[in-house]
Amino acid sequence: MSASKISALFLDIGGVLLTNGWDRTARRRAAEKFNLDLEEMNERHHLTFDTYEAGKLSLDEYLARVVFYKDRSFSRDVFKTFMFDQSQAYPDMIDLIRNLKTRYGLKVAAVNNEGRELSIHRIRTFRLDSFIDSFISSSFVHVRKPDADIYRAALDIVQAEASEVLYVDDREMFVDVAKGLGIKGIHHRSYQTTKEEMGLHGLSLGAF
């Protein structure tokens, strides 16, 4: 399938390596735990979350708009701890990427939409920097997917040709945008399907 040898992987984090950091399921749990109006919280979230993910708001500023616009019986620190605790790893995917990197000497970069504090927490907690070389997070580069400029920035930072990059994301539209730049892509649906598709691009573990 792949005419060019793959030298670099671009990876989404939420939905691929880890659970999503702060999605509708996590917000529903928060509303139940802290007795919040879920509909109002979601409306406020959607109005301001893009700004947070683009690195133009701190987490405290985001929470001031979405949760702490009125007095609460709980503290911001308690709520932030709850937010951070929603993140869980997908160990099979992490092991797959780690082993492929070792076997093929791949450059590995994360290309994801995430606020700064959540990004840093997840990188440190799950030691993502032990196998990911570069983090092109929307909050670091101030560009969000599906803006093609985030992929252009990633290519420049990693110093890779688009034809030699394989990108894995659970959002098919994001994969399609990257393909428009000549980047090969896999729409991640499960560990098994992604592993099989990577094999079609010349990346398999065999008897590793």
Regions found by a protein language model. Name each.
Residues 12-15, 55, 100, 110, ...:
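Generic structural signal for small/hydrophobic residues in well-ordered secondary structure
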Residues 34-45, 71-81, 203-208:
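Short, surface-exposed acidic
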Residues 50-80:
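A metal-dependent, Asp-based hydrolase signature
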